[in-house]
Amino acid sequence: RDDLPEPQALRSVNGVLELHLNVGYASMDMDLPDSDIARWARYPADRQPGRRLELRSFNGRYTAPTLWLRPGDTLKMWVHNQLPASPQGSDWALLNHQNSTNMHFHGLHVDPREIRPGVFGDYVVDGPDAGIAPGATRYHEIHLPDDHSCGIYWYHPHLHGATNAQVSSGMFGAIIVADAQDPFRASVNMRERVLFAHKLTVNAKGRTDTLEDSMQNPAGAFLLNGAYQPTIVMRPGEVQHWHIVNPSSFYPL
């Protein structure tokens, strides 16, 4: 049985894709390996079924929607930060803003400025004490040039001092810029799938409250679309097109 989770897919309509992303904590039940040793020593490892985690998220989900765009399209995105006030106590001031955020459209060749008052492009120059604070909203308007390269890109927070804790929680999504006239897509009847190979790291309480939680704790696992060791089923002769993203902080594939 194929049990690989599929991120929600959204497609542009008449050249426009509109999306509201609510940033907040979400309770998620996830199967994780029973120990750090088990993860490396054997396959498949024993699992802790349905472990309850509290993770920062977009719209209450692990991984954000996959956005399907075409060259010339416009993406309109509202990011609503509904997180509580940031935890304090770090000796480094830049690490006391873990619940402020922003948005980076990774790899897109688009305007990086504040395009006009209150309308932002791929704007990631916020200092740690700026960005989208808890309770605030930011509107992004991303216009793809008509000659924009097709391929897979991704979007994620990029606020210095807070990025790792948020991306480690699953705050990321794919952007696929596709050409409807692509002869490869037109010539093969195939299933297209997005695969996030991601290292989830949480503390003993199942949270990623601080930078240290997202870097130094062994309680976690490598996941594929939020699932631990899922099964992918293919028929003989079947063709699938896999779009693979590694949103982990330190781990190459």
Language-model segments: residues:
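Histidine-centered copper-binding motifs that mark active-site loops
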Residues: 1-253
